[in-house]
């Protein structure tokens, strides 16, 4: 019985220790060297909103014709005394970048096709070329302490997905892409 108890304590320590390393406070989110605030029309200007952890942005292996990026973001809700940590991964289809679609359209115009330019906009709205996945990374109080409350998966996804062209949720994956590769996704040929 004593062994089970000690094993349980050890296991609990292994599970909580990694979560404490990811915890952030409201004050830390305001450090512009580590976090970048993602402007949103929903922000009140009182420290709420989404923050990208610049140190977490990294490219990961992707199939041919794609690029993938992982990062951590934090959604701050000061009035609720809550910060929601999220681990996100975006997949970018290189043949769906705006520059690629414009180049393909220009080539078809040179070959006599009379498709109007608005078709590029419509094609991009149908499929932005960016798909994302979101995982809950933990919930924290504004002071950085771990909070046991969890946000529902539907709410997590609604905060940043889907990345539709022309929509506010399109900013985050584009910011991540620019941080990882030094060029905007839609400027890729």
Where are these regions (language model features)?
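Classical Sec-dependent N-terminal signal peptides that target proteins to the secretory pathway
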Residues: 1-23
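N-terminal secretory-pathway/extracellular module detecting exported/lumenal segments
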Residues: 22-87, 91-189
